[in-house]
Amino acid sequence: MIEIDGSYGEGGGQLVRTAVALSAVTGEEIKVTNIRENRPNPGLKQQHLKALETAAKICGARVSGLSQGSSELFFAPVEIKGGKYNIDIGTAGSITLLLQCIMPALPFVEEKVELTIRGGTDVAWSPTIDYLKHVTLRALEQFGYAGSVTLKERGYYPRGGGSVSAVFEPCKLHGFHFRKTEGNKKTESNPVGEGLKGEKSMMEEIIGVSHASNLPAHVPARQAESARSLFLEAGYDARIDVSSSEFFSTGSGITLWKGYCGGSALGKKGLPAEKVGRQAAEEVIKELRAGAAVDIHLADQLIPYMALAGNSSFTVRELTLHAATNIWVTEQFLDVKFKIKEKEGLFEVSVG
C-alpha cells in the first residue's frame, strides 16, 4: 500500500485526484492522510466526493473515508472497466476537475468509456470546458491519448446545471516532446506579417469563445471585443466566437488559446465585461511572450501522462507548486524520475 501525505506541497484537491488516478492505473492500494490540511475548510469537499465516487465506480474500488470533511481516504482499485456512466455532481461542482481524477486511467480500459456529466462547466479554480477541449485534450493527443468532450449546456456558479458528454477509447501512449512554435515568442527579428505566405494567420492567430447565459447579448460581445483589441495592440490576430444562450444558470466567461497556451476569465456581478475579456487576453499574452512550449496550467496537468507515456518533455515559464506537487505524487507510483533544468529563462521538464 502506498501512503500519501495529502498536505505535501500544494496540498489541495489535485494531489488527491492524481493519487487516485494513478492508483487505478497501477492497481496499488493507497491511503491519503492530512487531506487539504492547511486549507480554510480542511478535508474533502462535496465536489471531491463525486470525482472519487466516479473513479471508484470505474475501477471497482473499495473505498473508505468518502465523506465531506474527511481528512483520510483509503482507495483499493480492482479493474478499470469501460461502459456508460451518468454522473450528476450537483450544483456547480467542476466537471473538468472530475474528469481530471479519472482521465489518466482511461487509456487502460478494455472498452470505451462514455460519460454524461452534469455540473459546472465554467467555474472558478478549475479549467474551463473550452480549455479542456481545445488545450488539454489537444496536447494529450500528442501522446496518443484518445478522448473527446462535447458541451451540451454551460453551467455557471452557483446553480450549475451544465451538461457535458465525453468519450474515451483504450489507447497506447507514447512519448512526445513539446516545443515552442516560432510564433509564440515575438522578437524584433520576427515581426508579425513576415515570413512565408499564410504564415501569419497560421502562427499568430489566437482562437477563443466568449459566452453568456441569461444576460444581454452585448455582454459576451464586449468581452470578446476587449480581448481582441488587446491582442491587436500586442500584434496578434484573434478570432473569437460569441455566443449568448438561455441555460439553467446565469453567468459569462471567455476562454482563449493558441497552441498549448490558453487563458480564461469568468464574469461576476459588478465586474465590467471589458475587464473579463482583458484579464483572459493578458493571461494568454503573458504565456506567448515567455516563449514556452506550454502554459503554466497545462504543465501540471501533463505530468502523469508524461510519466505513463515515457520519454517526454516540455518547457514552461514557471514551475508552479501545483506542477512540483504533481511530479512528487507521480514519482510515488511510477518508476520514473523527472528532470528539471533552467534553460534560456524557462524551465525544461523531462522524463524517460
Curated annotation (Swiss-Prot):
Tagged with keyword Nucleotide-binding = yes
| Compartment(s) | Cytoplasm
Q: Which CDD domains match?
A: RNA_Cyclase_Class_II (cd00874)
MF annotations from Gene Ontology: ATP binding; RNA-3'-phosphate cyclase activity
User: Which Pfam families does the entry mention?
Assistant: RTC, RTC_insert
Q: Name one GO biological process term.
A: RNA processing
Protein origin, superkingdom: Archaea
Q: What is its EC number?
A: 6.5.1.4
Q: Which GO terms describe its cellular component?
A: cytoplasm
Positions in coiled-coil regions: none
Q: What SUPFAM superfamilies is this protein classified in?
A: EPT/RTPC-like, RNA 3'-terminal phosphate cyclase, RPTC, insert domain
Active-site residues per Swiss-Prot or TrEMBL entry: 322
Q: What class of enzyme is it?
A: ligase
Q: Which UniProt keywords apply?
A: ATP-binding, Cytoplasm, Ligase, Nucleotide-binding
Instruction: Detail which positions bind ATP.
Output: 100, 297-301
Does the keyword section mention Amino-acid biosynthesis? Answer: no
Q: Give the reaction(s) catalysed.
A: a 3'-end 3'-phospho-ribonucleotide-RNA + ATP = a 3'-end 2',3'-cyclophospho-ribonucleotide-RNA + AMP + diphosphate
HAMAP family membership: RTC (MF_00200)
Concerning its family, UniProt says:
Belongs to the RNA 3'-terminal cyclase family. Type 1 subfamily.
Q: What's this protein's function? A: Catalyzes the conversion of 3'-phosphate to a 2',3'-cyclic phosphodiester at the end of RNA. The mechanism of action of the enzyme occurs in 3 steps: (A) adenylation of the enzyme by ATP; (B) transfer of adenylate to an RNA-N3'P to produce RNA-N3'PP5'A; (C) and attack of the adjacent 2'-hydroxyl on the 3'-phosphorus in the diester linkage to produce the cyclic end product. The biological role of this enzyme is unknown but it is likely to function in some aspects of cellular RNA processing.
The name of this protein is RNA 3'-terminal phosphate cyclase
Q: What is the species listed in this Swiss-Prot or TrEMBL entry? A: Methanosarcina mazei (strain ATCC BAA-159 / DSM 3647 / Goe1 / Go1 / JCM 11833 / OCM 88) (Methanosarcina frisia)
Q: Taxonomic lineage of this organism?
A: Archaea, Methanobacteriati, Methanobacteriota, Stenosarchaea group, Methanomicrobia
